[in-house]
């Protein structure tokens, strides 16, 4: 799952660089990764949830709809 985590970080980092004062919509990240790589929507969603709990990502809402790198 290290590859998946890196893809999530890359996608969120690109968004945060372009829009530093906004949170990234996690469904956009999930859809982009699951469309371009061999990960299911659920796998990406679960990994984002883990990364929020680990403190790697910050979530604005309790359902992890909007995420940001810490």
Where are these regions (language model features)?
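Short acidic, hydrophobic short linear motifs in intrinsically disordered regions
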Residues: 19-34
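Short amphipathic alpha-helical interaction segments
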Residues: 38-50
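Alpha-helix N-cap and coil->helix boundary residues
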Residues: 3, 24-25, 43
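Short, cationic-aromatic polyanion-contact patches
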Residues: 5, 62-70
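Short alpha-helical segments that sit at the start of domains
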Residues: 1-20
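A short, conserved structural fragment
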Residues: 52-62
